């Protein structure tokens, strides 16, 4: 059996095979050539999306297989890089906070609820932070410095992401994280280490003064204290409020 291949197929695959408008390949040779696509993402029964790493870019190709009544199959390979990148930009704008590059509220809730509904969690903590001194920074040094203060804390939170936590900017000066683990003891230690690292961070607001980075936090535990997202958030919010006002 032989496979009819157009010249554009070779061009899409980055293979210089022929100068003719089309050629025929043995089935075995065709299958070997198509291995350059790797493992694709099945979008439907007959359509798959492939990602190929080029020297300076990523290319996305969509392969659609059409089955004819006579038993023959026709494959159409399209370059859909522009379409996929546009969709990725839209999804990023939908899911991420522009100032901090953390999840926004909607994306955080979807991700956390997916984990809660997975049936795979043994223990987790939902932590809510409220930045201390942000109003002071804004009023004294301006909102640009306030944005730097916010980003500084967001950069610390990204360390929790490396531990598998889901993190977000909840509102102007509030942040949340959902941290999973094998036990409360393990998660407590990770939270403690995070707080210790934050206490060593400060924002240089002028030549003579650095403002320590500070935030009040509340923690609630899954499954011991709550099992659904709304309850976990409500309890963490209350715990954060109590922590913030008990230190005033």
Language-model region placement:
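N-terminal capping loop/helix in small sensory signaling domains highlighted by a polar->aromatic N-x2-3-F motif
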Residues: 3-13
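Conserved long alpha-helical elements within nucleotide-processing catalytic cores of c-di-GMP signaling
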Residues: 11, 91-95, 102-125, 132-162, ...
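Terminal output helix/cap of sensory domains in signal transduction proteins
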Residues: 13, 20-53, 116-117
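Per-ARNT-Sim (PAS) sensory domains and their PAS-associated C-terminal
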Residues: 41-61, 71, 209-211
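Signal-transducing coiled-coil linker helices
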Residues: 60-98, 106-116, 166
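Output-coupling edge of small sensory domains
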Residues: 64-68, 201, 220
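Cyclic nucleotide signaling catalytic output domains
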Residues: 167, 193, 216-224, 231-247
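Catalytic core regions of nucleotide second-messenger enzymes
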Residues: 169-170, 187, 198-215, 244
């Amino acid at each position: 059996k032989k496979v009819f291949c157009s010249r554009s197929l070779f061009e899409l695959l980055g293979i210089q095979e022929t100068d003719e408008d089309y050629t025929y390949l043995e089935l075995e040779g065709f299958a070997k050539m198509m291995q350059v696509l790797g493992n694709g993402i099945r979008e439907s029964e007959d359509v798959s999306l492939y990602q190929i790493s080029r020297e300076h870019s990523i290319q996305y190709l969509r392969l659609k297989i059409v089955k004819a009544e006579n038993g023959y199959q026709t494959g159409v390979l399209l370059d859909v890089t522009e379409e996929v990148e546009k969709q990725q930009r839209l999804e990023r704008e939908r899911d991420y906070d522009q100032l901090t590059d953390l999840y926004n509220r909607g994306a955080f809730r979807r991700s956390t609820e997916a984990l809660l509904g997975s049936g795979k969690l043994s223990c987790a903590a939902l932590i809510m932070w409220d930045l201390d001194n942000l109003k002071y920074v804004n009023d004294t040094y301006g909102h640009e410095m306030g944005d730097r203060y916010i980003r500084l804390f967001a950069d610390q939170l990204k360390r929790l992401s490396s531990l598998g936590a889901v993190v977000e900017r909840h509102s102007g000066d509030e942040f949340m994280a959902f941290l999973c683990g094998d036990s409360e003891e393990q998660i407590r230690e990770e939270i403690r280490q995070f707080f210790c690292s934050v206490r060593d961070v400060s924002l240089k607001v002028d030549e003579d003064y650095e403002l320590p980075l500070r935030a009040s936090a509340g923690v609630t535990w899954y499954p011991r204290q709550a099992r659904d997202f709304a309850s976990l958030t409500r309890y963490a919010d209350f715990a954060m409020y109590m922590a913030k006002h008990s230190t005033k």
